[in-house]
C-alpha cells in the first residue's frame, strides 16, 4: 500500500492559504519581511505563513513523516437518551493507539452530521470520561455539576453533533503501566526532539483521519473544541490541520509565561516512577481539589526551556500568530474576563483579526467566497437579496467577498472563574451551527 506523508495527506486537494500580510509582530520585527499591500495578498502571505509555522515547529518538533494504517476498533457500549456511545481506538503511531468515546446521536444515523473532536482538560485519570459525562476529575469521581461544563462532549452530542471524546497521552486509558497520570518522561525518552504538545496535535490529526472514515459523518464539516488544557490544544490543532473546518479554544493558556512550572518543567530525574516511590503532589492543588494529585512531571514543550533559563532571550513566535495559522477557517476564542486580562488575549485577537478581515481571494488560488457558497444557508442569502434588493447572484457574491473572512473570527468573555458556564456553551452551539451548517436535531 502506498504510504503518504502527513504533509502530502493534508495538502492534497486542500485550499492553499492566501491572505493579506500584516505588519510583523514586534517580537519578530528583525526576522520577518516588511508588510505589503493587501493587493499583494496571494504573493506574500504563503511565505509569511510558512515562516510562522516553521517557528512553531522549531519549538514543538516536526510531525512524523509516515502515517500508519488506522486499524480502528469500534464497539458499542450503550444507547440512552437518543445517543449511542461507542468505545473506539485507532493507531496514532506504530506502537501507540488513541482511545476515545464516540457519541452518535440517532439523527446522524438517518442523515450525515458534522463531527466535533472534544479534548478534555487536565484530569487525574478520568480523561475522556470527563467530557463524555461519565466521571469528574478522577475515574472514581461522579460527573461534575452541569454549570461547570466539564461534560461538554455529551452536550454537543445532545445538540446533534457526532462527538469524539479522546484521551490525551498520559491520561485516561493512555496512562502507561508504571507511570503516573500526566507523566511525560516516558514520552520524552522515546521522542527526545518532539513535544507532548506536538504529539497531542498529531493525535487530533489522527482523530480527523478516523472521523472521515465514518459514513454518518460529514467529512468536510469537522470541528475541534476543548476547555483548559483542551482549549489550548484545540487552537494548535486548528492551526496545523487545515481539514478542521471550525475551531473553538475555550479557557486555554494563550500566553507565554517564563516560569518553570508553566511550559518546560525540569523533573528531578528522568527515571520512571515505581511502586513505593513517594507521592508527587502539590499542596495548592490539594487545597483546591481536596485530594492528592500524585501526578508526574508534565513537560509541555521541552525546547522552551532556554527561554525560561534566559529571561532576556527572544521568543521566536507568539499566540497571535498561532491564531493567524487558523485563518481563514472559523475560530472562536472563549475565556473568562480574568483570563482575557492575564493572557493578554485582546491584543492578540486584534492582530489575528487583521488577517481575517484583510483576507482576499486571488486568481489561481482557492476561493474563500466559494467556501461561503458551499455552506448550508447560502441559498437563503441569495433568495433574500435577489427578492428584496433585486441583486444578481454575482453582485451578492462581490459585495459579501469584501468582508474577507472577518466574520469568521471572534472572541467572547464571561464573568467568573476558570470554567465552561452555560453562556459559553450557548456561544459554542451558535458558532458551530453557523459555520458547520448544522440544524440541531437529536432524533
Identify the role of each PLM range:
Residues 2-16:
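N-terminal secretory signal peptides and thylakoid transit peptides that target proteins
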Residues 23-43:
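C-terminal segment of N-terminal export signals and the immediately downstream linker at the start
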Residues 69-108:
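N-terminal cap/lid segment of alpha/beta-hydrolase-fold proteins
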Residues 111-121:
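Short beta-strand element of the alpha/beta-hydrolase
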Residues 120-205, 259-262:
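Cap/lid segment of the alpha/beta-hydrolase catalytic domain
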Residues 190-191, 249-322, 341-351, 355-379, ...:
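Mobile cap/lid helix-loop segments that gate and shape the active-site cleft of serine hydrolases
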Residues 209-269:
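Primarily recognizes the serine-hydrolase "nucleophile elbow" in alpha/beta-hydrolase
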Residues 362-365, 369-443:
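C-terminal catalytic histidine-bearing segment of alpha/beta-hydrolase fold enzymes
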Amino acid at each position: 500500500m502506498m504510504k503518504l506523508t502527513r504533509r502530502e495527506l493534508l495538502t492534497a486537494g486542500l485550499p492553499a492559504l492566501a491572505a493579506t500580510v500584516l505588519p510583523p509582530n514586534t517580537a519578530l520585527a528583525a526576522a520577518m519581511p516588511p508588510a505589503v499591500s493587501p493587493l499583494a495578498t496571494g504573493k506574500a502571505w504563503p511565505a509569511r505563513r510558512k515562516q510562522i509555522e516553521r517557528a512553531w515547529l522549531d519549538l514543538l518538533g516536526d510531525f512524523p513523516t509516515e502515517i500508519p494504517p488506522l486499524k480502528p476498533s469500534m464497539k458499542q457500549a450503550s444507547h440512552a437518551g437518543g445517543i449511542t456511545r461507542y468505545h473506539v481506538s485507532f493507531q496514532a503511531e506504530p506502537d501507540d493507539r488513541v482511545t476515545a468515546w464516540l457519541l452518535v446521536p440517532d439523527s446522524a444515523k438517518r442523515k450525515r452530521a458534522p463531527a466535533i473532536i472534544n479534548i478534555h482538560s487536565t484530569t487525574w485519570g478520568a480523561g475522556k470520561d470527563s467530557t463524555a459525562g461519565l466521571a469528574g476529575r478522577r475515574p472514581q469521581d461522579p460527573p461534575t455539576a452541569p454549570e461547570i461544563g466539564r461534560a461538554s462532549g455529551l452536550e454537543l452530542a445532545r445538540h446533534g453533533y457526532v462527538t469524539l471524546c479522546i484521551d490525551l497521552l498520559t491520561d485516561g486509558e493512555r496512562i502507561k503501566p508504571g507511570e503516573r497520570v500526566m507523566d511525560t518522561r516516558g514520552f520524552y525518552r522515546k521522542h527526545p526532539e518532539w513535544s507532548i504538545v506536538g504529539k497531542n496535535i498529531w493525535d487530533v490529526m489522527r482523530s480527523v483521519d478516523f472521523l472521515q472514515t465514518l459514513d454518518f459523518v460529514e467529512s468536510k464539516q469537522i470541528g475541534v473544541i476543548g476547555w483548559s488544557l483542551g482549549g489550548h490544544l484545540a487552537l494548535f490543532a486548528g492551526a496545523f490541520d487545515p481539514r478542521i473546518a471550525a475551531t473553538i479554544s475555550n479557557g486555554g493558556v494563550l500566553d507565554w509565561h517564563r516560569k518553570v512550572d508553566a511550559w518546560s518543567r525540569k523533573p528531578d530525574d528522568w527515571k520512571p516512577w515505581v511502586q513505593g516511590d513517594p507521592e508527587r503532589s502539590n499542596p495548592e492543588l490539594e487545597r483546591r481539589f481536596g485530594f492528592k494529585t500524585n501526578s508526574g512531571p508534565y513537560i509541555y514543550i521541552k525546547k522552551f526551556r532556554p527561554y525560561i533559563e534566559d529571561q532576556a532571550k527572544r521568543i521566536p513566535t507568539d499566540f497571535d500568530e498561532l491564531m493567524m495559522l487558523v485563518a481563514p477557517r472559523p475560530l472562536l476564542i472563549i475565556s473568562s474576563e480574568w483570563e482575557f486580562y492575564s493572557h493578554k488575549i485582546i491584543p492578540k485577537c486584534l492582530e489575528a483579526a487583521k488577517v481575517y478581515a484583510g483576507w482576499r481571494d486571488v486568481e489561481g488560488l482557492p476561493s474563500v467566497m466559494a467556501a461561503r457558497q458551499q455552506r448550508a444557508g447560502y441559498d437563503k442569502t441569495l433568495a433574500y437579496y435577489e427578492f428584496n434588493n433585486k441583486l444578481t447572484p454575482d453582485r451578492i457574491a462581490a459585495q459579501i467577498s469584501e468582508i474577507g473572512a472577518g466574520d469568521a473570527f471572534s472572541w467572547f468573555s464571561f464573568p467568573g472563574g476558570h470554567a465552561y458556564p452555560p453562556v459559553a456553551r450557548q456561544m459554542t452551539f451558535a458558532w458551530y451551527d453557523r459555520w458547520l451548517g448544522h440544524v440541531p436535531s437529536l432524533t
